[in-house]
């Protein structure tokens, strides 16, 4: 298998794990209006449709610490600590959320074709679309369009605090659906997947302390 195909496969199999970073997104250069997330974590729970793609490649997934694998009655998920994140969570209009972040830990995807260690997970959310990049077996990928983030379909809980003060935010069960670009890249490398842009590949839950800009 070529290095390019390995990278595409590793990214595609781990794609649902590149998710949405606790309601934040793109660009430290916008810190005049972007706050920060601290004490954060992101949990990515993939759907039966995503599991079917893993099964197609006879793939198993394990977490790389400090990320951890969660298996319970609701299915399988991986929880990642948030290393850094900046953005505007747009608490009164979640679909407008934007920002960027990095996750600690990673995943190991094992298939008969090889082992893929996916680390250095980064994600950017802008205009409702999540892009991401990572390192696959140490080789850095470029930023790729991955998912449409259904932030408006998630559930938001935020503890009331005085204006301008840090507040704890939790957003749950945000659906991720593949973008046309991510499906095109997968199709070019491996043939058409059994999913469409309407398929929910994962649900993301995130929590952290949001500190508004200027604090």
Locations of regions flagged by a protein language model:
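N-terminal secretory signal peptides and thylakoid transit peptides that target proteins
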Residues: 1-15
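Cleavable N-terminal signal peptides
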Residues: 14, 25-26
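Extracytosolic secretory-pathway proteins
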Residues: 30-110, 115, 121-215
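C-terminal segment of classical bacterial N-terminal signal peptides
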Residues: 18-24
């Amino acid at each position: 298998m070529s290095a390019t195909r390995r990278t595409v496969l590793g990214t595609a199999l781990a794609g649902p794990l590149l998710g949405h970073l606790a309601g934040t997104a793109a660009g430290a250069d916008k810190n005049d209006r972007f706050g920060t997330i601290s004490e954060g974590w992101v949990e990515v729970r993939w759907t039966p449709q995503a599991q079917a793609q893993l099964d197609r490649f006879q793939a198993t997934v394990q977490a790389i610490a400090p990320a951890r694998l969660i298996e319970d009655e609701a299915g399988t998920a991986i929880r990642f600590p948030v290393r850094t994140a900046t953005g505007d969570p747009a608490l009164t209009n979640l679909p407008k959320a934007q920002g960027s972040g990095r996750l600690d830990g990673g995943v190991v995807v094992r298939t008969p074709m090889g082992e893929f260690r996916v680390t250095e997970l980064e994600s950017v959310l802008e205009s409702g679309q999540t892009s991401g990049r990572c390192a696959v077996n140490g080789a850095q990928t470029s930023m790729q369009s991955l998912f449409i983030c259904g932030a408006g379909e998630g559930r938001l809980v935020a503890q009331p605090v005085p204006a301008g003060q840090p507040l704890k935010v939790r957003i749950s069960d945000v659906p991720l659906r593949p973008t046309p670009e991510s499906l095109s890249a997968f199709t070019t490398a491996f043939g058409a997947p059994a999913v469409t842009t309407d398929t929910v590949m994962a649900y993301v839950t995130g929590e952290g302390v949001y500190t508004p800009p200027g604090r």
